[in-house]
């Protein structure tokens, strides 16, 4: 009986997790985020500063760039611009959006 209960609980968690992942993909949110919160850019802000210092590395630079459809210069943001910050990230992406320099 206990094994059946444990298996049922694990299956429920797996189904809910799959539904959440599908919903986030539908919303286009990176890092398996479940929602976003707004952030108004202040003078001198960069995505690096926002991700690392303000949000204490709970979101990645590239997660911010992808969520806000920022192109190949992830630090090209403007004062008073409202960014969406993905929350509850399961993975953090600090590199996939950055240009790779070949020597």
Curated annotation (Swiss-Prot):
GO CC list: extracellular region
Record-annotated LysM domain positions: 37-85
Intracellular or extracellular location(s): Secreted; Secreted, Cell wall
Binding site for chitin: 44, 48, 75, 77
Main location: secreted
Signal listed as a keyword: yes
Signal peptide positions on this chain: 1-18
Effect of loss of the gene: Produces no to only a few pycnidia.
Superkingdom classification of source: Eukaryota
Protein induction: Expression is up-regulated during wheat colonization.
Cystines in this chain: 31-89, 62-97
Extra remark beyond the main annotation: In plants, chitin acts as a microbe-associated molecular pattern (MAMP) that is recognized by lysin motif (LysM)-containing plant cell surface-localized pattern recognition receptors (PRRs) that activate a plethora of downstream immune responses.
Assembly, per entry: Forms homodimers in a chitin-independent manner through interactions at the N-termini of Mgx1LysM monomers. Homodimers are further polymerized in a chitin-dependent manner.
Role this protein plays: Secreted effector that enables the plant pathogenic fungus to manipulate host defenses for successful infection. Binds chitin and suppresses the chitin-induced reactive oxygen species (ROS) burst. Chitin-induced polymerization of homodimers forms a contiguous Mg1LysM highly oligomeric super-complexe that is anchored to the chitin in the fungal cell wall to prevent hydrolysis by host chitinases.
Domain notes per entry: The LysM (lysin motif) domains are small globular domains involved in binding chitin in eukaryotes. Mgx1LysM contains one LysM domain.
UniProt family annotation: Belongs to the secreted LysM effector family.
Protein name: Secreted LysM effector Mgx1LysM
Gene name of this polypeptide: Mgx1LysM
């Amino acid at each position: 009986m206990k094994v059946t209960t444990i298996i049922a609980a694990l299956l429920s968690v797996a189904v809910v997790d799959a539904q959440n992942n599908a919903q986030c993909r539908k919303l286009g949110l990176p890092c398996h985020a479940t929602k976003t919160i707004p952030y108004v850019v202040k003078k001198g802000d960069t995505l690096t500063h926002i991700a690392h210092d303000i949000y204490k590395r709970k979101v990645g630079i590239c997660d911010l760039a992808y969520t806000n459809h920022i192109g190949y210069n992830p630090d090209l943001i403007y004062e008073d611009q409202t960014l969406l910050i993905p929350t509850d990230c399961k993975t953090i992406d600090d590199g996939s959006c950055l240009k790779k320099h070949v020597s």
